[in-house]
């Protein structure tokens, strides 16, 4: 009788983590940034039917990178949890922190179970507050851990490089156009450092806007509105460059 092949628990968990990370890395990256009036979600997504970003509840948004069918199941479960809790208790009792805890338990259970493969997903759960200080952003990797993020966060294939780029350039109090411009610039950078152009029709953009009078703060930005914001960001860049040139000319005089 042959001896069963033995794999240490540490090696088994390391293999599962590597499997999940490789699956997530095959997906396109996305970024979530705070700006003066809320939180913006930006990602490259050529599909108009399959969304990376979704509304979960009044002030809560959801973003995901990885396998679509897996994070879509999680999204649907999150919507059901939020609806049931809001109906049973109060709408204010539905929070991003509570939802992140539910997702963490689900992902952690699946990751540690030898009976099924780990989910190849990385999630972001965000809640817009009454003020920027009240905004909450949580990142949930494949293993179910929870990371409390501030300012900006990137997930997906090139997340580490994009996060470094954002950390160096993101500022508090940015306008939506400025935040959108920074997000697109970060997503346009390839792994070798070169830049490429992402057309507006390949961008998926959504916001949690605290200034909206409606109870539901989630809104998708598409079509002409997205084009206007991108043009405004480009115009502000050109204006800054022109001002810098004028200052240089004055100095030479």
Swiss-Prot record:
Q: Where in the cell is it found?
A: Cytoplasm
Stretches of Low complexity bias are at: 232-242
Q: How is its activity regulated?
A: The formation of the proteasomal ATPase ARC-20S proteasome complex, likely via the docking of the C-termini of ARC into the intersubunit pockets in the alpha-rings, may trigger opening of the gate for substrate entry. Interconversion between the open-gate and close-gate conformations leads to a dynamic regulation of the 20S proteasome proteolysis activity.
| Pathway(s) served | Protein degradation; proteasomal Pup-dependent pathway
Organism lineage: Bacteria, Bacillati, Actinomycetota, Actinomycetes, Kitasatosporales
The UniProt subunit note reads as follows: The 20S proteasome core is composed of 14 alpha and 14 beta subunits that assemble into four stacked heptameric rings, resulting in a barrel-shaped structure. The two inner rings, each composed of seven catalytic beta subunits, are sandwiched by two outer rings, each composed of seven alpha subunits. The catalytic chamber with the active sites is on the inside of the barrel. Has a gated structure, the ends of the cylinder being occluded by the N-termini of the alpha-subunits. Is capped by the proteasome-associated ATPase, ARC.
**GO terms for biological process, alphabetical:** modification-dependent protein catabolic process; proteasomal protein catabolic process
Q: Which keywords appear in this protein's UniProt record, sorted alphabetically?
A: Cytoplasm, Proteasome
The family database entries (Pfam families) matched by this protein are listed as:
Proteasome (PF00227)
Transmembrane stretches in the record are none
Function (record text)? Component of the proteasome core, a large protease complex with broad specificity involved in protein degradation.
Q: Can you name a GO cellular component term?
A: proteasome core complex, alpha-subunit complex
Its gene is prcA
The entry assigns this protein to a family as follows: Belongs to the peptidase T1A family.
Q: What protein is this chain from?
A: Proteasome subunit alpha
Q: Name one GO molecular function term.
A: threonine-type endopeptidase activity
Region annotated Disordered, chain positions: 232-253
Record field: compositional bias (Acidic residues): 243-253
Main localization (coarse): cytoplasm
């Amino acid at each position: 009788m042959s001896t069963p092949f033995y794999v240490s628990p540490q090696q088994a968990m390391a293999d599962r983590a590597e499997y999940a990370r490789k699956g997530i890395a095959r997906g396109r990256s996305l970024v979530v940034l705070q700006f003066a009036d809320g939180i913006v979600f930006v990602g490259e997504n050529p599909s108009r039917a399959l969304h990376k970003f979704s509304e979960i509840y009044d002030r809560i948004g959801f973003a995901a990178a990885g396998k679509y069918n897996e994070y879509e199941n999680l999204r649907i479960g999150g919507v059901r949890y939020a609806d049931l809790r809001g109906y049973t208790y109060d709408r204010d009792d539905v929070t991003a922190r509570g939802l992140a805890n539910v997702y963490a338990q689900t992902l952690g259970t699946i990751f540690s179970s030898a009976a099924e493969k780990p989910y190849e997903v990385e999630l972001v759960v965000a809640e817009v507050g009454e003020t920027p200080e009240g905004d909450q952003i949580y990142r949930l990797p494949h293993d179910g851990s929870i990371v409390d993020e501030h300012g900006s966060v990137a997930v997906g294939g090139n997340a580490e490089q994009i996060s470094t780029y954002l950390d160096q350039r993101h500022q508090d109090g940015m306008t939506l156009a400025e935040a959108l411009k920074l997000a697109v610039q970060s997503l346009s950078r390839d792994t070798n450092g070169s830049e490429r152009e992402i057309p507006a029709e390949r961008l998926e953009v959504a916001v949690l806007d605290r200034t909206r009078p409606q109870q539901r703060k989630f809104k998708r930005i598409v079509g002409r509105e997205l084009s206007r914001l991108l043009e405004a960001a480009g115009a502000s860049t050109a204006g800054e460059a022109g001002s810098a040139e004028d200052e240089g000319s004055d100095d030479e005089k």
